[in-house]
Amino acid sequence: MKIQAPKGTKDVLPEESYMWQYVENKFREVCKLYGYQEVRFPTFEYTELFQRGVGDTTDIVQKEMYTFLDKGGRSITLRPEGTASTARLFIEHGFASRPMPQRFYYIISAFRYENTQGGRFREFHQFGIENFGSSSPVTDAEVISLAYNFFTSLGLDNITVNINSIGCPVCRKEYVKNLKEYFSANSQKLCHTCHQRLDKNPMRILDCKEEGCKLITKDAPKPIDYLCDDCKSHFESVKTYLDSAMVSYKVDPFIVRGLDYYTKTVFEIVATVSDKELAICGGGRYDNLIEQIGGPSIAGIGFAIGVERLLMLLEQNGLLPARSQVPRVFVATIGENGIKKAFEIARMLRFEGISTVVEEMGRSLKSQMKYADKIGCEFSIIIGDDEIEKGVCKVRNMKTSSEEIVEIENICEYLKEKLQK
């Protein structure tokens, strides 16, 4: 068998990794501006966390999780998303006793056994934030504003924020009852999966991507029409505060999100690509999740961003920066003394923040210069017995092939000046 990456996974190569670093750093910057702190949690959790947190009736739990028994017979699952793990972390480490709200962000890989067509992966990457402790609509607007401003900081201007409210467990009962009646009357048009959803959780039908189900959904009851006074007031306030935050939005009455823990505000951010909408961020409020997995009654809200989709979008729109050249300087050596001196010169340059590599393979000077050219170095330093004796080194400009003699003690200042031009 040929050894290769498993289906649905992808290696990130050196020529791509700078793009990942760019968006990761941008996300960190924006999160810090909003007062969020990074958390890191295990790649796997006890399966029960996702069964209770994400929901037994969701496609994620029923079809997509990577679950196995460990050697102790415990059921373990590779995380399919980040919210449940962050909620578990919040409970386990006693954050409920700290000042509220608590603001967390994370950068993770997640795992779902999905069809790999259409650019989907079985290991994929997410940026996410979670805000615990505030049930205020101000928090909803702040969270949506953070996501919106992250995308605009990357130069994306063809994005739309779609918002909705799916109400609380009290007012949702009436909505679900009417929704079930509507879909039951049209059950012959539903796909096989949605027939199963009809009894367990009819709201999941609104998420179905099958064309037949999408057509029926257009005339289905809308959760926004069944909101109680409290949920209605909350949603109106969210819209008011988004206006104040200068975040443009549209109300989409059929956004429900694919996870069972959501309450009240839900939202998606989509980008327009070739006249088609591509979801790049999704989130919402989950006021019962902490209690659902064994913690106190504490409200929460958050979102997740698909990194692979985001990078594809940035690349298509020409919004990624040029790859910075690494390394910038190559130290070519002649003889044993040259090798020893190369360590000293490289250490000096690296201390000044100049990316430097030294010859490691004992090649001829001609071969060393070819190598330096192939890896894109801007300058090569040549050091051997003659140069050491005089306290100098040769510096070759790899673009022009011109050479200058520079005193070793001045090499850092010389290259700093040249590399700035």
Swiss-Prot record:
Its EC number is 6.1.1.21. It is found in: Cytoplasm. Its main location: cytoplasm. The gene is hisS. Homodimer. This is Histidine--tRNA ligase. One of its GO terms (cellular component) is cytoplasm. Belongs to the class-II aminoacyl-tRNA synthetase family. It catalyses: tRNA(His) + L-histidine + ATP = L-histidyl-tRNA(His) + AMP + diphosphate + H(+). It comes from Caldicellulosiruptor bescii (strain ATCC BAA-1888 / DSM 6725 / KCTC 15123 / Z-1320). It comes from the Bacteria. One of its GO terms (biological process) is histidyl-tRNA aminoacylation. NCBIfam families: hisS. GO terms for molecular function: ATP binding; catalytic activity, acting on a protein; histidine-tRNA ligase activity; transferase activity. Keywords: Aminoacyl-tRNA synthetase, ATP-binding, Cytoplasm, Ligase, Nucleotide-binding, Protein biosynthesis.
